[in-house]
Amino acid sequence: DLHSFPTRRSSDLFVISRQASVARGLEAALRAVPDADVVLVHDAARALTPPEVVVRVVGAVRGGACAVIPALPVADTVKEVELAPAGSPELVVGTPDRSRLRAVQTPQGFETAVLVAAHHVGSRRAQDEDLAASDDASLVEALGRPVTVVAGDPLAFKVTTPRDLALARTLLGTSRA
């Protein structure tokens, strides 16, 4: 709840979407390294991502792919549902072919010019978290550009729930990671 943040004035707290945050980070990075030919966008919640994933992503971009995502095949059956009002049951409307589904991870890699163009074209969406892209590859897809998939890694999971944190602590061999 944003109202629980201690602030002196309402102007002390400025909330932006994930997409807008990445766009600002991209601008800052390119001011610092204006001749960068490859940009990686990584989710800090994926703190255990093995270096080999980064190597695969960068290698694919440098090998000619304009956008690259690491991903794993989806193991569970996935259902598409009809959205229902809160408290009402959802109804299944379809079952996608699991063999074509991938769980996407980060870092996602891009030719710099492609990512800049994707954020420029998608900038209106960035102002509203409900409309903002959930990842940068989606912005590139919206440009009609191809997105290449490389092998992800199970260790690149997001640490977002208490269960995830417990798993991360176990993997790191600590009780307080």
Please give the residue ranges for each predicted region:
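Short acidic donor-binding/metal-coordinating loop in glycosyltransferase active sites
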Residues: 14, 42-45, 106
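Single conserved hydrophobic/aromatic residue that forms the stacking wall/gate
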Residues: 1-12
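Conserved active-site beta-strand element of glycosyltransferases/polysaccharide synthases
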Residues: 147-151, 157-160
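Residue-level signal for inorganic ion chemistry
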Residues: 25, 42-43, 73, 111, ...
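SAM-dependent methyltransferases
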Residues: 135-137, 154-155, 162-177
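Conserved core of the sugar-phosphate nucleotidyltransferase
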Residues: 48-148, 177
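Short phosphate-binding loop-to-helix
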Residues: 11-37
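Glycine/small-residue-rich pyrophosphate-binding loop that anchors the diphosphate of NDP-sugar donors
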Residues: 2, 105-107, 156
